[in-house]
Each structure stands twice: as structure tokens, then as C-alpha cells.
């Protein structure tokens, strides 16, 4: 059963991904050690800041985001990860789609408009924190923080 699920989710083959945004979040994602033991491989990092383009980040050279459609012909990424401010996220999504990428993980706090053949998933840190905040209203968690757990 596990083998069949792995096959259905396409985790039995390498899944190539690019990250757009070489700031704090993008840098952390490129260096995430969990990718080493997964099917996912980060094959490119892109940014629009000319002072970052050409620099090395881990073992990847930061490329100009505007060149993503051209460079993905060689990289062959099928997943794009957006780690840019909200104001730039839709443009980045458009670049990813122009590059032939049909699966997008979006960390920007904005809803993306994508064609029907593209799947976009949003990671909303604030919403997740709100959910955690709701769960704090449990008897053991009421009180003054860590001291109430004792």
C-alpha cells in the first residue's frame, strides 16, 4: 500500500523545484536539509535583486528571475516555490507558468490567479498561528505560559 501511495503521489521519482526569492525565507529553503532524504531537489534559485544575481547560495548560483522561462528549459523543474513579497508574487507566478511549471507553493500572503491546469498552494503563516492561538484555550494551556505546564 505504501509503495502504491508513493507511486500515486509521484514520490518514487525526483521532483525538481525552483525557488524564486533569495531573501531570508528562500535562503532557508535552499539550505533545508530535509530535501536530501526526499524526492524533492532544488535545482535553481532566482531573484530580481541585481546585487544578489550571480552570487552563490549553498551550491546554487542565484539567477535573474526574468530569465526563469528560458533557464527552466535546462533545469526541467516542475514545481515552483514563491518566497517573495506579496507585491511581486503574481508576477513571479506568471514567470513560473511561462516556464512550464504547473505546481506552485506560495509563501506570499496573497491569493494567486493561475490557469486551471496549474495547482497553487498557499502557506499562510498568520493563519497557522491563529489556529495555534485557538488551541491555546485548553485547560492545561491557560495561565502564564510555560509555568502553567508544570
Question: Where do the language-model regions lie?
Answer:
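Hydrophobic, well-ordered beta-alpha structural blocks that scaffold small-molecule cofactor pockets
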Residues: 1-99, 115-140, 150
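Short secondary-structure boundary segments
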Residues: 84, 107-109
Amino acid at each position: 500500500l505504501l509503495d502504491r501511495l508513493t507511486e500515486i503521489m509521484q514520490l518514487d521519482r525526483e521532483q525538481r523545484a525552483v525557488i524564486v526569492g533569495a531573501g531570508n525565507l528562500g535562503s532557508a529553503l535552499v539550505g533545508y536539509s530535509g530535501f536530501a532524504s526526499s524526492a524533492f531537489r532544488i535545482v535553481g534559485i532566482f531573484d530580481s535583486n541585481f546585487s544578489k544575481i550571480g552570487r552563490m547560495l549553498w551550491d546554487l548560483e542565484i539567477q535573474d528571475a526574468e530569465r526563469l522561462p528560458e533557464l527552466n528549459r535546462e533545469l526541467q523543474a516542475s514545481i515552483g516555490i514563491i518566497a517573495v513579497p506579496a507585491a511581486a508574487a503574481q508576477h513571479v507566478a506568471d514567470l513560473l507558468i511561462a516556464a512550464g511549471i504547473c505546481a506552485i507553493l506560495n509563501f506570499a500572503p496573497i491569493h494567486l490567479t493561475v490557469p486551471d491546469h496549474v495547482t497553487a498552494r498557499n502557506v499562510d503563516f498568520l493563519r497557522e498561528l491563529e489556529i495555534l492561538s485557538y488551541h491555546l484555550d485548553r485547560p492545561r494551556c491557560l495561565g502564564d505560559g510555560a509555568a502553567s505546564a508544570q
